[in-house]
């Protein structure tokens, strides 16, 4: 039996946990449904990877804020057309079993690289700051790596176990569960690029949360050579998405971050929206210091290692096309090779 099916018990438990943790009951209620949806989809879909802000709080325990969206993708092994078609039916089945409604089901398509399912739940605790809709975003545009297995839990489930109510947690299916989740290192990198992209497009509203997340993640992530290599690899992958402007050739991440700091373009949104979602206070002035650390670290500066990775990616691509066999040849004849490929593609397109 699910806890929300017993309305009186559900309300009582939420109120008790709310008083104990000093967290708004509406946030606890929404977190419960986020967790139940995530658990059910994870049970239905092989190769599922959980990523984004909610994974940071729910699995990594790296941030102390409420995150309401579920970001999902598939690992490279399961990223096939057949497996992608399984995701939508799994979400539909999940919502049916939990008694929830997908508001925009007719707008979603299994073949798309991106779908956002907007799921409504029966609201018991009203709060103007909390939207009673859970977004499940399924993205197949970029490969998700690296990942690891972590435990996921709801606020209610975690509280019940910590306070000697394990039996009740078991009865209501509120035990934690294993799920593949993107590492915090990769998520930190994605958030730095995303923060720059949103600034470039002047899409600032509700994106200042990335500043808070970056600040908190820096407490757990070691900025070393391995991290720098991952930055370069992610930059090269993001480059193939035209919306990822900050990953394109010539974009200077440190300069973009300095602009964010100097213009304070995210400050108003941070103090209006992000700060309302925090379980523990963290001022804008404190959070923005994380960007200064990133700038001074040099981790996002284009360097010789990044140039090597670009050569390797290009070499692998050209080798698949059976154009070259030796990377040294690539270094010496890169311009001529690319020109030759463009001529061949043009010939094919005009044929």
Residue ranges and their predicted role:
Residues 314-318, 330-334, 342:
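Short hydrophobic targeting helices and cationic amphipathic motifs
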